[in-house]
Structures are given as structure tokens and as C-alpha cells.
């Protein structure tokens, strides 16, 4: 349905923006490695 398509679009937009936001807001330590993992899987597709 149109509603489901819109929801999927919003979700995809959030997924694409999240790594960028996380890059600038991440604390030191383990989350840095998590970000690298997310970034790698993003470009792997």
C-alpha cells in the first residue's frame, strides 16, 4: 500500500543517515569499531 511504501522510504532514509550521525556523535572506544562495521556492511551491498 501507499502507507507501507512511505514507511519503507522513511526507514531507508534513517538507515542511510544513521552512520553519518553516529560518525560525528560516537564516544571513544568500542562504538568506533561498531561504526566501522556498519560502514563496511553499507558499502559491501
UniProtKB/Swiss-Prot annotation:
This is Cytochrome c3. Acidic tetraheme c3 is not a subunit of this octaheme cytochrome c3. Heme 1 binds at residue 42. One of its GO terms (biological process) is anaerobic respiration. Participates in sulfate respiration coupled with phosphorylation by transferring electrons from the enzyme dehydrogenase to ferredoxin. Keywords: Electron transport, Heme, Iron, Metal-binding, Periplasm, Sulfate respiration, Transport. The keyword Electron transport applies. It comes from the Bacteria. It is found in: Periplasm. Homodimer. Binds 4 heme groups per subunit. The keyword Oxidoreductase does not apply. Heme 3 binds at residue 45. One of its GO terms (cellular component) is periplasmic space. GO terms for molecular function: metal ion binding. It comes from Desulfocurvibacter africanus.
